[in-house]
Amino acid sequence: MKYFSIAGLQLDLELNNNKDLVIEKINQTVVRYPWLNMIVLSELAVGGASRSEEFLLDNNIEGFQNLAKEKDIWLIPGSFYHRQDKQITNVAPVISNKGEIVKLCTKNYPFEPYEKGISNSNESCIFEIEGVGMFGVHICYDLWFPETSRALAMQGAQIIIHPSLTDTCDRNEEKIMARATAIQQQCYYFDVNAGGKQGCGQSIIVGPEGEVLTELGSSEEVALLEINLDKVDQIRRRGIKGLGQPLKSFRDNPVYNNDKIDKDYLISLGDLEMPKKLK
């Protein structure tokens, strides 16, 4: 396998209407780092939480396809709301260096009850770059559900890309989960969070043994990673530090299934709604 270079753009974003800024920053990044193969942006980077027509996927995707082709880079320009069949989903497009849409990755778990009215997905998003390896994508709150990353790893993903939009006080918990995910799935974990008025930054890149490779602050920065995914396969074969081989164990004994879910207990937890004041 050959080496592959990725940049994560943690940008100082306005609440919405960031398209021109995003394009400018992509252009600047390619000039400064001409050896890059892929650029990734944060969740909803262009339009933020707005669901206005101008920020929807269909009204933005062609421009980013043209940009990816022009700059000869793979591009995940964050995510966009996508209106289809009377539903709205949160979708991260994967665009090849030829300008082709390789995948539309839909967020499995919208951030309910805050991301109200957004439909979920039960499909995993995985794609292959020939000669490089297998990539998985899940979006923001999907990180909180280890089943999503396990599903990606069990389909062969050697790196998980994670566009995120977090501006809340639980960012430290998310960074802990990013490390745990990399360890449990024995893969690279590439998290890009929003900055500026959208998010609190602190993007993190983790290696397949849980080692923190890059951790950004809260200001505008670029996270860089150069990978050879043969390392992931070696660790999965031999174990982390020559010890645990969790993917093999799960392969041989996949204990998690719907028959073992206590539905009565889960129902007793109540509706998925905004918390009320404690009495």
Give the ranges of each region predicted by the language model.
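Active-site-proximal beta-strand elements of phosphoester/diester hydrolases
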Residues: Y3-L15, V40, L104-T106, G133-D142, ...
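Short loop/turn motifs at secondary-structure junctions
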Residues: S5, P34-W35, M134, G156
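Conserved hydrophobic/aromatic beta-strand scaffold that supports enzyme active sites
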Residues: G8, V91-V94, L104, S124-I126, ...
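Catalytic metal-binding/acid-base residues of hydrolase active sites
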Residues: D12, A45, F80-Y81, P110, ...
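Cys-nucleophile CN-hydrolase/nitrilase-fold catalytic domain and related Cys-dependent amidase chemistry
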Residues: N16-I101, T168-I183
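CN hydrolase (nitrilase-like) catalytic-core segments centered on the catalytic cysteine
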Residues: L57-L75, W144-A223
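Active-site catalytic loop in hydrolytic enzyme cores
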Residues: R83-Q158, T168-I176, A180, I240
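C-terminal beta-strand edge segments of enzyme domains
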Residues: I126, A194-K279
